[in-house]
Amino acid sequence: MRAIAIALIPVMLAACSKSEPRPSSDTGVVTVDTAGNASQSTPSPSAMAFKITSPAFAPSGSIPSKYTCEGSDTSPSLEWSDAPSGTKSFALIVDDPDAPDPAKPQRTYVHWVVYNIPPGTTKLPENAAKGGLPSGALQGRNDWKKQTYGGPCPPIGRHRYFFKVYALDTDLTFASPPTKADLEKAMQGHVLGNAELIGTYEKARK
């Protein structure tokens, strides 16, 4: 019996090592490598307090159709607070990791890219993508190759939409409007903290 028990130990350890990693916090210091992969280091107290919300929908709640392709594709109002000290600008990325089918996701679809949002900014008004951004803020290219917000338009099922704001210790400069990948590469080593809001959407059945 002792031999059997000892033999089981490696099996149990192997099983534990194959379990899914614990999800990272949605706030803290994020480092983005050149491949666009983000890793998270120990956050400062101010970074841990950083948060983003929207008056349009609750965290993990359903996004109203007004803000989707079935409505007017209006960008929702976003608000954030308790940004880390030393913030020189904010960047915003909105994407959908469930494309095209949440049961078999194959890619992350990018809906909005904004950068050089002034450090004193604490919110973006509704429809900010169409002339309502603060002075100095610029829009990058989404996956429709447009410099604006493109609302949720999932072909299959209910998708998640991640609204991610990053506090940076610098402004960013690009020769041409950046993609999400361009922005993530430029942010590498400059992220003081980040906050995340998730909304969901599924097209109305006809």
Residue ranges and their predicted role:
Residues 4-5, 48:
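Generic detector of short alpha-helix boundary/capping microenvironments
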